């Protein structure tokens, strides 16, 4: 049973690990708002953390295709806050996460065959146990408070967050962030039956 003082999924995960007295090299936090997450996203996280001992945590990102990019922009124009985007450097360490669609893309400067340089952050996390236990000791920072994104607490405390680029391999991927998302997700699930 979780206590009521946990403010987000990462704090709940840390509390569960502490209560269960788990001794593990890696903790995976699979959150309920991403029911379409395929298993290889988690496998890729585990592999990436095994190869990079500098990262405090890792999270998957999916490059948006033009259709999904359009959905993200339409949602924002409607005032809906949903899909989180991630920006990262050449080393794949996160620079920022936002509920805005970042980076801005001037489509007139992007050739028709170019990939959109926007990545959807998937709400699944792999943590090193020491980083997870430190997380609950850090205060909520200004960026986390403003964006409402728990992973920003790691960045605000100078922790390396690895963005692991994953492919949906032809599957439709969408998270549950707004009431309209329920219908989208249910249609994907129905089509897969």
What residue ranges belong to the model's regions?
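Conserved alpha/beta core of the MobA/IspD/sugar-nucleotide pyrophosphorylase nucleotidyltransferase superfamily
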Residues: 22, 97, 111-193
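Structured catalytic cores of enzymes that bind and process phosphorylated ligands/cofactors
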Residues: 4, 24, 37, 52-59, ...
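Short phosphate-binding loop-to-helix
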Residues: 1-47
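A short acidic, often aromatic-flanked loop/helix-cap motif at beta-alpha or helix-coil junctions
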Residues: 5-10, 65-66, 171
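Conserved core of the sugar-phosphate nucleotidyltransferase
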Residues: 38-138
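Short, surface-exposed amphipathic charged segments that create phosphate/polyanion-binding patches used
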Residues: 14-18, 72-77, 180
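Active-site donor-binding loop signature of nucleotide-sugar glycosyltransferases
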Residues: 2-4, 32, 88, 99, ...
């Amino acid at each position: 049973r979780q206590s009521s003082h946990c403010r987000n999924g990462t704090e709940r995960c840390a509390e569960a690990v502490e209560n269960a007295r788990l001794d593990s090299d890696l903790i995976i936090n699979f959150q309920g708002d991403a029911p379409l997450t395929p298993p290889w996203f988690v496998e890729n996280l585990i592999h990436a953390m095994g190869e990079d001992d500098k990262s405090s945590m890792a999270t998957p990102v999916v490059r948006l295709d033009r259709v999904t990019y359009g959905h993200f922009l339409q949602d924002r124009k409607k005032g809906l806050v949903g899909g989180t985007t991630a920006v990262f450097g050449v080393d794949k360490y996160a620079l920022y996460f936002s509920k805005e669609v970042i980076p801005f893309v001037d489509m007139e400067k992007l050739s028709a065959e170019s990939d959109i340089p926007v990545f959807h952050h998937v709400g699944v996390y792999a943590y090193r146990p020491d980083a997870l236990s430190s997380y609950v000791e850090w205060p909520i920072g200004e960026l986390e408070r403003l964006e409402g994104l728990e992973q920003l607490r790691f960045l605000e405390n100078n922790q390396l967050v690895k963005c692991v680029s994953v492919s949906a391999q032809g599957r439709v991927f969408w998270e549950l962030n707004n009431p309209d998302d329920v219908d989208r997700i249910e249609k994907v699930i129905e089509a897969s039956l």
